Amino acid sequence: MKKIALLVLLLTVGLVAGRAQESRQDVSISGSVLVEPWVTSTTDVSAGAKRAIGGLASYRFMLTPRGALEANYGFEQNNILYKGPTFLNGYKVNVRNQEITAAYVYNFTFRKFNPFVEGGGGALLWQSLRNEATTTLDLKNQTTIVGLYGAGVAYELSPSFDIRLEYRGILSKVPNFGDTLLNTNKYYNIYNPVIGVAYHF
């Protein structure tokens, strides 16, 4: 009888531990850099931007010991310069970017290092800001559907905390803010390195 009780206890502990492992979650806060490459197109309109510094907040839910679902919210502010045959001096658009994406993350484990890769998608919200850094244009806010991919590594500081370093790529159509004058009809790969701290619970 004692052996059966012990066996039931061990199975229960194992099941609870397994479920705890499967339901492990984490949140992370990171600093990010958004690098938009210079784009030229068949419409003779080109577009480019300075490097933008911002932030990224992420939440991960572990489906398995290696696989997780991730939700992201990012925020940056930048200037995009458009040039074309009829506006050689260019139009400067001051932009606030917001990222809302989700991805599947696959983790590897090597001692305290946890490399990972991810892929997913979502949306970028482009908000044109009216201020002295913006050329006067009748522009509208725009949302583009994006693809997301990335790879990085997490270094475990403790069972609850790790440092996370990642390169992310965001595939998006170049925005025109509702103005056909700014059409490039091009997609580009936005580079987005991030570094931050994650808390596991």
Predicted ranges, named:
Residues A47-A52, K92-E99, N141-V146, N185-N189:
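Short sequence motifs at beta-strands and strand-loop junctions characteristic
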Residues V33-L56, Q142-T143:
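Surface-exposed strand-loop-strand hairpins of Gram-negative outer-membrane beta-barrel proteins
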Residues W126-G169:
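A charged, solvent-exposed segment within the mature domains of Sec-exported extracytoplasmic proteins
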Residues S28-L34, N72-G74, E118-G122, E166-R168:
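Transmembrane beta-strands of outer-membrane beta-barrel proteins
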Residues V39-S46, L81-L88, Q127-T136, P175-L182:
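Outer-membrane beta-barrel translocator domains and adjoining extracellular loop/strand segments
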Residues L11-V16, D26, A68-E70, V146-L148, ...:
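A broad helix-preferring feature
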Residues M1-R24:
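Cleavable N-terminal export/targeting peptides
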